[in-house]
Amino acid sequence: MEMQGDSGGAEARWERLAPGVVRRRLPGWDATVGAIAGEGGVLVVDTGSSLHEGVEIRREVQELFGPPVTHIALTHPHFDHVLGTAAFAGVQVYGAVGAADLLRRDRDELRHDAVRHGVAPDVAAEAVELLVLPHHPVSGELTVDLGGEVRVLLANVGPGHTAHDLAVLVAVPGGPEVVFCGDVVEESGEPQAGPDALPHAWPAALDRLLALGGDDAVYVPGHGAVVDAEFVRRQRDALAERFGVS
């Protein structure tokens, strides 16, 4: 499904990657959100850092494609990628296995992390209180059929940036394969290894990502500009050197 002709200002904020596949770089932390549209549904990749951002993403994606969002894939359980999820009523939410348990157990830490990074305390508290957890845990690979020959592969490529890293891959007729990487790949800054990262496993996660996407895919980092396979390989090697693994 292609973007609609009259989509107001939304079209200017979303980058077209392939027919029916777009992404937007959100203000603040330069986090990526994506959308993939088929004839029978629309899948959104990540939901931003607040309910306000989630509402804006939902509205703009519907302006771009017409049908409402039906599926969400959360690439990892960090505040800037999940706190808008409650703005999408009635959708099917996917995450790497264990992500839902972590988000359920560590709500206070999620809220504190958001506030530490500059989210207003009341905004963070509201989003965490209403947070929608993934209904569908992905332990290996799972295909979501959006109709009209659009099939989205959800792949648990972690651990790496976190213990629960999910990649989203789609190949549509007339376009390149597109890989939404989450924060296992970052372009606008050094990859961030927080206290929940598994540094020694991270290079292997990128090996899995490259094996799935291949040399000709378009790779969409969790933060920053779109990159190619060679960039991902260089980042993989830099992480291996940084963390002392082969």
Where are these regions (language model features)?
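Divalent metal-coordination and catalytic microenvironments
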Residues: 20, 36, 46, 61, ...
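Binuclear metal-ion centers of metallo-dependent hydrolases, dominated by the metallo-beta-lactamase
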Residues: 228-246
